Amino acid sequence: MVAHRARRRKRASATQLYQTCKQAGTCPSDVINKIEHTTLADKILQWGSLFTFFGNLGIGTGAGSGGRAGYVPLGTRPTTVVDASPARPPIVVESVGPTDPSIVTLVEESSVVNAGASFPNFTGTAGFEVTSSSTTTPAVLDITPTTGSVHVSSTHFTNPSFVEPPVIEVPQTGEVSGHILVSTPTSGVHSYEEIPMQTFAVHGTGTEPISSTPIPGLRRIAAPRLYQRAFQQVKVTDPTFLTKPETLITVDNPVFEDADTTLTFSPSGVAPDPDFLDIVALHRPAFTTRRGGVRFSRLGTKATMRTRSGKQIGARVHYYYDVSPIAHTEEIEMQPLLSANNSFDGLYDIYANLDDEAPVSSHLSIATPSRLPTNTVPLSFSSQTTNVTIPLGKYWDVPIYSGPDIVLPTGPTTWPYAPQAPFDTTHDVVIHGSTFALWPVYFLRRRRRKHVPYFLADGGVAA
């Protein structure tokens, strides 16, 4: 940390110190010697001047006045003489006495100059002659009308700025001879047609939109942040806080406004409830859910301190009242839709093992390589019977319905054998399996480190 030195204050001059400390007798010796010229240098000059005399050279301890005769200028420029402006004659001020006329003549009397023009000469003595006429015909001016028709138009404007109150009147129709022009100003109305209004909805369900274009979705309103560090949390147990909170702050007064608005109070010394002491404002209520219950909350402002300027300082308090708890949702045990005796292992496919016996005409035996049963499956054909053995990873017993008997065409028994076309026909396969059938390609996929031979023996499978 850098230490800052104090600013050096200027010391008073010796003259100022001598004026203040001479009378008190506390002046330092150097100040007295400097002011009274008693220093060592002053004494040497005083002693030396007693024995030396330099004449009129002006060398001494006194002021430099140049001796008795003064300094002699060595060589200077001559002074320049400035011409003075001529003096103006004084203005004579004439005094006006009480007997002098108050009218001041602007132009002095002067002689009249004759320009040479002759003066008019009047010879008559009877005055002016008046001439009268006895004609009684009025003077009529002959005005020839111009060619063309005269157009007279009238226009009506409505300005709401100069109408009190501003109203809209029916405009007057403007007429022009020969032409009809109907014009309506912007602020007016034109010829209208009365259309009776009809009621489209009489009884509603309560779900109608309140605007023409309702906003899709829901708008989440931000919840009040009542659980901050700036708010003091106070729990209220009196149920009067819900309906008449003012009775907890001051004396009951029926003039108070509705309890759903912000209530203001004057600071009082004593409150019926000590938790509401120094409360000057109680804001609007709010219902919130917290920790499994419905809570009624209000924010209050206290006026604990008051400054000289009139500003009130106090804490903000969050008053809450727990109305009722929210019951937990009952957990309903899920019941299986199928009976318990139907146990299925793994996924359902066409090779699923069904315990229920069904009347089948034949059974297909499927076994693993370690266990190869030799069950035969008699398939209904008209000419021959084929035995099929399919080794798979697990033993399943799948019922297969063979369908109707189809007589296949056969060739002659004599040699050479000539096959007839078509040799075989497509047969219907009806398998009562589960919800889906797995594509056989997925059974033939090879997996690592598991070598199981998949093969079909004894020809093809037909059903």
UniProtKB/Swiss-Prot annotation:
It comes from the Viruses. It holds the Pfam family Late_protein_L2. Disulfide bonds join 21-27. GO terms for molecular function: DNA binding; structural molecule activity. Highly phosphorylated. GO terms for cellular component: host cell; host cell endosome; host cell Golgi apparatus; host cell nucleus; viral capsid. It is found in: Virion; Host nucleus; Host early endosome; Host Golgi apparatus. A motif (Nuclear localization signal) lies at residues 1-12, 444-452. Keywords: Capsid protein, Cytoplasmic inwards viral transport, Disulfide bond, DNA-binding, Host endosome, Host Golgi apparatus, Host nucleus, Host-virus interaction, Late protein, Microtubular inwards viral transport, Phosphoprotein, Viral penetration into host nucleus, Virion, Virus entry into host cell. The keyword Disulfide bond applies. Minor protein of the capsid that localizes along the inner surface of the virion, within the central cavities beneath the L1 pentamers. Plays a role in capsid stabilization through interaction with the major capsid protein L1. Once the virion enters the host cell, L2 escorts the genomic DNA into the nucleus by promoting escape from the endosomal compartments and traffic through the host Golgi network. Interacts with major capsid protein L1. Interacts with E2; this interaction inhibits E2 transcriptional activity but not the DNA replication function E2. Interacts with host GADD45GIP1. Interacts with host HSPA8; this interaction is required for L2 nuclear translocation. Interacts with host importins KPNB2 and KPNB3. Forms a complex with importin alpha2-beta1 heterodimers via interaction with the importin alpha2 adapter. Interacts with host DYNLT1; this interaction is essential for virus intracellular transport during entry. HAMAP family: PPV_L2 (MF_04003). This is Minor capsid protein L2. It comes from Human papillomavirus 30. The lineage of its organism: Viruses, Monodnaviria, Shotokuvirae, Cossaviricota, Papovaviricetes.
